[in-house]
Amino acid sequence: MAASRSPHIRLLHIRDEINGVTDAIKGVSFEDYRESYALRRVSERALQIISEAARALPVELTGKYPAAPWNAIIGIGNILRHEYQHLDDRRLWEIVTVHLPQLRGVVLQMLSDIGDA
């Protein structure tokens, strides 16, 4: 198995994207986010990467961590790629500010369980 396809590497990608987008929006209001093309695109790209990395994780692994909404995580990538015209800034803001920090906790636990936090 190539290193870039390993679950460990995919989890690191998810963790790093969550950290990056969280840092990018730290201290930003929803109104400022909505008005900032750059912040919206940073958030969308991070979600695409997170979604793709989650899609590549084995079901045997994700099944052990039902606290994360894996199907929704994978599904947001499809929306970002194929139904981008229907994006809702408020919903993306909620995902980035509420749900990604929760996912980060699950991902850190997964990394710890497989031997790398």
What are these regions (language model features)?
Residues 1-117:
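Solvent-exposed interaction patches of small proteins and small membrane subunits
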